[in-house]
């Protein structure tokens, strides 16, 4: 899932898009470590389970988007019901819970309905980023 698609997906799902594309971060002369994005647990999941999401090394005070998606028919099919945004703290970190779904009705980043997504058979993932930075993707497997 590209950064452009992540921002577009978030705005399609009613999440306020950020105005900045990371120019302030690019203007800083301090070198930053590559961001880390993790989800725990990411396997043996059940429908409606809360997972812990952790981000570090991102830009401070920046808004990012997170969504559960799967490739369906050559396009991203994301869950608009759970897609949301989060903001990193002064050190570029964030920790929060996210509810994952074993199945959902997916939509493309443009908002076009794709149909049913079953994460028991599809390669579902949790992805995060904004138009300036892709934080990463973590594969989700359901038991």
Curated annotation (Swiss-Prot):
The gene is cagA. This is Antitumor antibiotic C-1027 apoprotein. It holds the Pfam family Neocarzinostat. The keyword Disulfide bond applies. Binds non-covalently to a chromophore which is the cytotoxic and mutagenic component of the antibiotic. The chromophore binds to DNA as a weak intercalator and causes single- and double-strand breaks. Keywords: Antibiotic, Antimicrobial, Disulfide bond, DNA-binding, Signal. GO terms for molecular function: DNA binding. Residues 1-33 form the signal peptide.
């Amino acid at each position: 899932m590209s950064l452009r698609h992540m921002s577009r997906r978030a705005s399609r799902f009613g999440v306020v898009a950020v105005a900045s594309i990371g120019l302030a971060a690019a203007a800083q002369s301090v070198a930053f470590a590559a961001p880390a994005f993790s989800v725990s647990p990411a396997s043996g999941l059940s429908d409606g389970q809360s997972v812990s999401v952790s981000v570090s090394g991102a830009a401070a005070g920046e808004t990012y988007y997170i969504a559960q998606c799967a490739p369906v028919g050559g396009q991203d099919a994301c869950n608009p019901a759970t897609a949301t945004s989060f903001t990193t703290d002064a050190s570029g970190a964030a920790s929060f819970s996210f509810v994952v779904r074993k199945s959902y009705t997916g939509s493309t980043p443009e908002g076009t309905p794709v149909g049913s997504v079953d994460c028991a058979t599809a390669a579902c993932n949790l992805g995060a980023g904004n138009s300036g930075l892709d934080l990463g993707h973590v594969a989700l497997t359901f038991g």
